[in-house]
Amino acid sequence: MWRRLIYHPDINYALRQTLVLCLPVAVGLMLGELRFGLLFSLVPACCNIAGLDTPHKRFFKRLIIGASLFATCSLLTQLLLAKDVPLPFLLTGLTLVLGVTAELGPLHAKLLPASLLAAIFTLSLAGYMPVWEPLLIYALGTLWYGLFNWFWFWIWREQPLRESLSLLYRELADYCEAKYSLLTQHTDPEKALPPLLVRQQKAVDLITQCYQQMHMLSAQNNTDYKRMLRIFQEALDLQEHISVSLHQPEEVQKLVERSHAEEVIRWNAQTVAARLRVLADDILYHRLPTRFTIEKQIGALEKIARQHPDNPVGQFCYWHFSRIARVLRTQKPLYARDLLADKQRRMPLLPALKSYLSLKSPALRNAGRLSVMLSVASLMGTALHLPKSYWILMTVLLVTQNGYGATRLRIVNRSVGTVVGLIIAGVALHFKIPEGYTLTLMLITTLASYLILRKNYGWATVGFTITAVYTLQLLWLNGEQYILPRLIDTIIGCLIAFGGTVWLWPQWQSGLLRKNAHDALEAYQDAIRLILSEDPQPTPLAWQRMRVNQAHNTLYNSLNQAMQEPAFNSHYLADMKLWVTHSQFIVEHINAMTTLAREHRALPPELAQEYLQSCEIAIQRCQQRLEYDEPGSSGDANIMDAPEMQPHEGAAGTLEQHLQRVIGHLNTMHTISSMAWRQRPHHGIWLSRKLRDSKA
C-alpha cells in the first residue's frame, strides 16, 4: 500500500515540490527569520520553469548556470533601475540577450523565461532590502533547490524516468486493445482511425520524452539505469510490432467470416494489454516482474494461420503477436542496438549566435515577441500609475506558451483561477487567523495545489493565489490591499499575452503544415532507401523508423493545433486530415517493413531497385505538389508522371505487398494535395510559391 502511495506520480511530485518550498520556511520560523524563509519560496518557481529539477548527467553544472543567470538578472535590474533606465528598455535588452539560449537546445531555452521571472521578482523586492540580498537569496535558494532534488532522486532512483516509462507501457496497452477491438470496423477509416491516431501520437510523444531522459542520464553506469535502458528498448520493440498493419479490410472480413479469428485476435490483444498494464505498475512501483505465459493464445492464432494459408491476415497477426509474446515472456529486447548513437550535441555558442541573429530565426522572433509584450505590460503599469508592474509582467510571462492553443488555454485557467483564489483569500483575511494556523493552512493548500497541478492548472492556480496573498500578508501586512489591484493586473496581463500571441509574428501551425508534410515525406523516402539497401543494419533501421514516426507525429500535432486556430480554411484542413490519414498508413507499413528488413527478408536486387525508384518518384510527386501551385504555372519545374509498377510473376511476398500499398497511398496523397491546394489561404507565408522559400 505504501508503495502505491509514495510512488504515485502526482503524490511524489507534490511531496517534492512542497518540501522544497516549506522546509526553508520552517527553518526560518525556528530561527526567528520567517521573512527570509518566505522569500526563499520565490526561487523554486524560477528553478521549476528553468527545468533545473530535470535529472541530468550535468545536473550541478546546470544549477551553477541557472543560479548565475538569476543573480545576474537581479543585479542588472537593480543597478539599471537605480540609473533611471526605463523598464521597457531593460526588459527588452534582457530578453533579446537571453533569447540565444533557445538556439542551444530545448532544455537551455527554458532559462530565458526563468531568468526573466527572477528579474521580475526583483522588481517586487527592490526598495525593501539592500542590493546584495536578492542575489544571496537566488544563489542560496538555487543551491538548496539543487541539493534537495539531487537527494530526492537519489532516494527514489530515477523516479521521473520510471513515471515516463510506466505511462508509455500503459499507452501501448490502450493502443493495442483499441486497435484490435476495431478489427471489423477497418472498412470505415474515418471512424476507426481517429482514436488510433490519438493513441499513436501519445505513444510516440512518450517515446521521444523517454529518449531525451535516457540521453540526459547517459553518463550513469549503475544497475538501475541499465535496467531502465533495457525496459525502454523493449518498449520500442513492442511499439514497432503493435503499430503495424496490412490494411487489407477485405481479407480481414473473409477470415472473420470463415473462422473465429476475430475472437482469437482480440483474446491475444487483451492478454497483451493486460500484461503491459501490469508491467507499467511494476516499473512505477519498483517491483520485479512476475512470470508470464501466452502460449494458449498464440497457439490458437497459429492454428488459424495454418488452416487458412491463403489468407495473409492470419499469418501476419501470428507473426507479430509471437514477437510481442517473446518480448513479454523473456523481458529482453528482440535485438541489440545502440540507443545513444546519436549524441544530440548542443549547438556551440558562436554558431548558435550566428543563427540567432538571422531575422528568420524562430528563437529571435520568440524573444522579440516576448520583449514587446513585456514592454507593453510595463508601459501599461506606468499609465495606470502602478509603482511596480511586476504582477502584470509575471502574468504575461507565465501564460505565454508555445502556440496559440496552449496560450489560450493557459490564459483561461490562469485568469479564472486567480479570480477565484483572490475572492477566497479576501474572505479569509477578514477572520484574522493566527500566524501558526495560517502557515499550516498554507502548507496544506500548497500540497493540494501541487497534487492537482498536472491535471488541472486552473484549480492549482486557485491554491497558489491564496498562498501568494497570505505570503504578502505575513511579509508586509498588506494582503487586503493586494487583492483588487492583482485582479486587474492579471486580466491586463492575460489580454496582453493573448494579443501578442495573435498579432506579433504568430507562428500559426496551419502555415507549417506544408513544411511538416514535406519533412515527413523526406523521412519516408530515407526509410525506404535504407530498407531496400543491400545490408541494412539494426541500429540505423531503428533510428530511421523512429524518425519516420516522429516526423508523422509532428505533422499530426500541427494539424490538430491548426484546427484550433482562428479564421482558417476548414476545407483545406479537412483535405489535409485525409492526407495525414494516408500518411499514418505509410508509417505503419514502414514499421512492418523495418522488422522484415532486420530479419533479412530482402527482395532480389533488381526488384528492390525497381520498387525504390517507383517509391522515390511517387514521393517526389507528392513533394512537388506541396511545393508548387498549379501544373501549368510552376515555371521550369517538372511535375513527374505517376509511376506504373509492372506486375511480377508469382505471388508477391509480404515486403512487396507493403511496398505496393505504400505506392498506392502516395498516389492517393498526390491527388488529395492537388485538391487541397486549391483551398489554401492566399496571404502571409502562403504567398510563397515554393516551399523551400518558406522553410525558415
Regions found by a protein language model. Name each.
Residues 23-31, 47-48, 72-80, 94-102, ...:
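Alpha-helical membrane-inserting segments
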Residues 8, 12-83, 94-100, 115-120:
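N-terminal cofactor/phosphate-binding cores enriched in small/glycine residues
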Residues 31-32, 346-447, 466:
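Core alpha-helical transmembrane segments of integral membrane proteins
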Residues 430-571, 580:
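Generic detector of multi-pass transmembrane helix bundles and their immediately adjacent loops
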Residues 110-134, 469-486:
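Transmembrane helix-loop junctions at the membrane interface of multipass transporters and ion channels
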Residues 27-42, 76-93, 134-140, 380, ...:
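Structural signature of hydrophobic alpha-helical transmembrane segments
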